[in-house]
Amino acid sequence: MLDLKRIRTDFDTVAAKLKNRGVSEDTLTHLKELDEKRRTLLVQSEELKAERNIASAAIAQAKRQKEDATQQIADMQKVSADIKTIDNQLVAIDQQVTDIITVLPNTPHDSVPVGADEEDNVEIRRWGTPRDFDFEVKAHWDLGEDLDILDWERGAKVTGARFLFYKNLGARLERALYNFMLDEHIKEGYQEIITPYMVNHDSMFGTGQYPKFKEDTFELADTNFVLIPTAEVPLTNYYRGEILDGKELPIYFTAMSPSFRSEAGSAGRDTRGLIRLHQFHKVEMVKFAKPEESYQELEKMTANAENILQKLGLPYRVISLCTGDMGFSAAKTYDLEVWIPAQNTYREISSCSNTEDFQARRAQIRYRDEADGKVKLLHTLNGSGLAVGRTVAAILENYQNEDGSVTIPEVLRPYMGGETVISPK
């Protein structure tokens, strides 16, 4: 959530930055006018309360002296009525301010490229060379069926579209991947966490999914619970409402969890395969950092995600998302896109973001600065390290062989009991 004081004191800068994120200046102008009216009413309310206190003292004095206080009482009743009217106006204005400010996206960092959509994203670097196949490559969904490791038909029967069963070495590959990912992140100083897979509405507000993106989630009817769309939500909200010791920062968390997404608005896109599912495993990284260190931590986090792809030998590129393509809470985002041979393109497999103090303000996560003893908002960061199903897809396609088998990447073999290849039965 943005700082209302910042909007008030640096309106033009905030308006210019949010314009690049599709926010109309009229919206901010209306917010500023509401804030000004609110501040004026607060002054009036305080003045009237002071007047009421004086009148109350005068009435008490008159009664002690057995004087007639009828007029003073009438005057005080009018003042009290005026205060109530103003207080009611303030409640209404506060709600309007909340309704606006809670759906405003974060302001982009100055280094973020300005653009409207993914066409304006900027490629930063590439790693690895896509393999030159001398046979016709298969899509991962066909490989999965031929190898009897992915069962889409029964997934649809048991649940519905965009669900599947992992079987045999497919299940072992999925498990090997997330264990490998977690182990690599732990080596980099991340604390492993097993989170709840349901969170309450306050947690969804804290990380920015609510109220704006409710339609993208699965809520449990007649409860305050939501299935997590990412482990970012419980990991970040772990410290919601707390003041941390500045000496302990930065703090690194990692977790593997299922992610549940309704994929509202995705009808017709990626209807086959592992790219877009309603339920998938993801290894998440979350950091809590001091403001002056958060962008250095973003680079480290991105490198942690890249490390996984490099050790798996999967070609990828790093993209800096433009202002029009970033997520709601992000101030800056790097996407990692892995090479998918059957589609002859790169597809997103990780997204690493610095939200600065946007989530921390919503969730009230602060730290006490050891230098001056002041309590300040910290910065939160989050990143995929990695989306496991998409990594399975990338391995199946990049490591496929002409005979229909798939070679298991070397780093995963110890996690798969020494298996080296997945072969057709």
Swiss-Prot record:
GO biological process annotation, one example: selenocysteine biosynthetic process
Keyword annotations from UniProtKB, A to Z: Aminoacyl-tRNA synthetase, ATP-binding, Cytoplasm, Ligase, Nucleotide-binding, Protein biosynthesis
Entry's localization field: Cytoplasm
GO cellular component entries: cytoplasm
Gene3D superfamilies (UniProt xref): Bira Bifunctional Protein, Domain 2, Serine-tRNA synthetase, tRNA binding domain
Domain of life: Bacteria
Residues annotated to bind L-serine: T230, A231, E232, E284, S384
Catalytic activity: tRNA(Ser) + L-serine + ATP = L-seryl-tRNA(Ser) + AMP + diphosphate + H(+); tRNA(Sec) + L-serine + ATP = L-seryl-tRNA(Sec) + AMP + diphosphate + H(+)
Pfam families noted in UniProt: Seryl_tRNA_N, tRNA-synt_2b
Signal peptide range: none
Family membership: Belongs to the class-II aminoacyl-tRNA synthetase family. Type-1 seryl-tRNA synthetase subfamily.
Record-given protein name: Serine--tRNA ligase
UniProt organism field: Streptococcus pyogenes serotype M4 (strain MGAS10750)
